[in-house]
Amino acid sequence: MMVAAQVIWGSFSLLRVLWCLLPQTGYIHPDEFFQSPEVMAEDILGVQATRPWEFYPSSSCRTVVFPLLTSGSTFWLLRLWEELGLWPGLVSGYMLLVGPRFLLTALSFALDWAVYDLAPLWGADRWNALCLLSGSYVTLVFYTRTFSNTIEGLLFTWLLVLVSPGVVRSPTSKKPTPGPRWHRYLLGVILAAGFFNRPTFLAFALAPLSLWGIHRASELGGIRALIQEALVLLPGAALAAVLCVATDSWYFSSLSRSTGVFLTPANFLYYNLDPQNLARHGTHARLTHLAVNGFLLFGVLHAQALQAAWQQLHACLRASPQTGLSRVRGARGLLSSSKSYLLLFYFTPLLLLSAFSHQEARFLIPLLVPLVLLCSPQTQPIPWKGTLVLFNILGALIFGCLHQGGLVPGLKYLEQIVHTPDLSGTTTHYTLLFTHTYMPPQHLLHLSGLGSPVEVVDMGGAEDRVLCQALNNFSRQPACQLAGEPWPCRLFVVTPGTNRHALEKCRFPLKNETLLFPHLTLEDPPALSSLLSGAWRKHLSLHVIELETPVVTKQPKAQP
């Protein structure tokens, strides 16, 4: 059985790497591009990009440290190789997409290492836990993307690695064995780094740190000794905080050309603690994480966690003081069991994050590691294997391939068009208009940031009338003339098949049309009747349509 589990883990690990390089076409959320690679591509490679509001000095809500370490380091290496002539033509839309993802994919194997190390401590079967981890579509898709939540999950996992020996006993020891002193320094670094990456990291760290503190207090003989132990965390935390503040201050000061100290976590909290600001990003019911997002990400594993929590709560309620001392001791034993601790690690951050009205599924991806440890006990086989496999296949297909799946291939197609040299030697002006899609990450077009003849327009979910008016304006724009000389102009509209009827209302003549399959817009899914018709493929495709533009001719000069 162990050999079979090792083969399964190895197969899923290989799939994780190869699918990253393929690459995955699914587009989960704009934050995977606009909180890291889009910004770093503009800063380091000088390409045309859209800078989100969080990365302006006046509204600096995101630390630049982790974008610099991930996307930034990747783009710097690409630029260096190209400048040295080691790999001419290396920088392309494909490399700008896959480079940062490949780095995150490599870092995701730190999860596997951590689970391998943690499983014996928490009474989990090591290889069953690794199979659950590597086979989860959350690992295959979310942990290979440039989300700040991905970094948060990696830091939370290694926080568990550092505190677990001080909370539970190892199979070879009768009591918890805290690690060496430098572990506490590193723990302080992780706490500060996690807070600067996403202040919500404190919600994930609360339960492990609290249990670590309780156990250390009981071992050291009181609160005073615990305080002295906790002070050991301060040097690492202070060092990481100073480095983050210094990096953010240097970065945002260079953008604003003025010196100042920038505390990005404070700005993040100030913004997100305002309910009106959260409402702009979407308002959800308080039970969304518990009743929807947990199932969406983890499927039957979330159901197992809910069942285990109910059983644990029911057992504790039965062991009340009126039933005798032995029952009380039994209740304490339940509360101090590995299962109880893992349930705390899972449900404490989930419930704390539920206090906020804006709840997205990706906020919960750091909970994957404690969940797979909880659901792979050494004494029991993994239940519902078939359901679990089917669920993860479906999740991987939807979020890794289908969801907004035509947009990244569409940008690659447009990159080839705008970089094809004109045989006549004249410069062509391109207008790329996106409507009813997620924001297009412009850095994947690999356009020069200075004087680019390509204009990218994001219309969002514009109404039909607004779209037609915009097309009418762009087809007759003054940009098609430069210093009185005519420019060849090409106008492209990128829209899902479910919205193509809006373009037909505008009555613009079409020059050509390219369909990119598959593309599913969950915000505007195709009707069931259209999927059952013969045109189902058109409704599940992204349409890249070139419109005929009026020929702009140079007006003859008036004779004197």
UniProtKB/Swiss-Prot annotation:
Function: Alpha-1,2-mannosyltransferase that catalyzes the transfer of the fourth mannose, via an alpha-1,2 bond, from a dolichol-phosphate-mannose (Dol-P-Man) to an alpha-D-Man-(1->2)-alpha-D-Man-(1->6)-2-PEtn-alpha-D-Man-(1->4)-alpha-D-GlcN-(1->6)-(1-radyl,2-acyl-sn-glycero-3-phospho)-2-acyl-inositol (also termed H6) intermediate and participates in the twelfth step of the glycosylphosphatidylinositol-anchor biosynthesis. The presence of a fourth mannose in GPI is facultative, suggesting that it only exists in some tissues.
InterPro entries xrefs: GPI_mannosylTrfase (IPR005599)
Keywords: Endoplasmic reticulum, Glycosyltransferase, GPI-anchor biosynthesis, Membrane, Transferase, Transmembrane, Transmembrane helix
GO molecular function, one term: glycosyltransferase activity
Pathway it works in: Glycolipid biosynthesis; glycosylphosphatidylinositol-anchor biosynthesis
Name under which the protein is recorded: GPI alpha-1,2-mannosyltransferase 4
Family per record: Belongs to the glycosyltransferase 22 family. PIGZ subfamily.
GO annotation, biological process: GPI anchor biosynthetic process
Transmembrane segments: 102-122, 126-143, 147-167, 186-206, 225-245, 333-353, 363-383, 388-408
Subcellular location: Endoplasmic reticulum membrane
Record-level GO cellular component terms: endoplasmic reticulum membrane
Main enzyme class: transferase
Endoplasmic reticulum recorded as keyword: yes
Topology in membrane: Multi-pass membrane protein
Gene: Pigz
